[in-house]
Amino acid sequence: MAKFATQLLLFVLIASLVMLEVHASNTFQVPDLGKRLLMNRDPNGFPCAESCVYIPCTVTALLGCSCRNRVCYRNEL
């Protein structure tokens, strides 16, 4: 009887892990960059990964970025 109980417990644990994996894979989806940009629209434009707290936009100015609210932004199209 103890062997049967051990096998049943092992089966239930494995089945639980499989079901957890199936449910987790269906709900976990990373949105692509386009969706993230559309969902998090900033009225200033797109951040250029440079701040302009003490020094104005230097490297990203070549890409068309300008300083607004102490962050370098590129105007939206």
From Swiss-Prot:
Summary of the tissues where the protein is detected: Expressed in fruit and pedicel but not in root, leaf and stem (at protein level).
Family: Belongs to the cyclotide family. Bracelet subfamily.
GO biological process, one term: defense response
Signal peptide residue numbers: 1-24
Protein name: Chassatide C13
Disulfide bonds: 48-65, 52-67, 57-72
Domain notes for this protein: The presence of a 'disulfide through disulfide knot' structurally defines this protein as a knottin.
Cross-referenced Pfam families: Cyclotide
InterPro entries: Cyclotide, Cyclotide_bracelet_CS, Cyclotide_sf
Biological function: Probably participates in a plant defense mechanism.
Post-translational modification: This is a cyclic peptide.
Propeptide segment residues: 25-44, 76-77
Superkingdom to which the source organism belongs: Eukaryota
Family matches, as PROSITE patterns: CYCLOTIDE, CYCLOTIDE_BRACELET
Cross-link Cyclopeptide (Gly-Asn) placement: 45-75
Keywords for this protein: Disulfide bond, Knottin, Plant defense, Signal
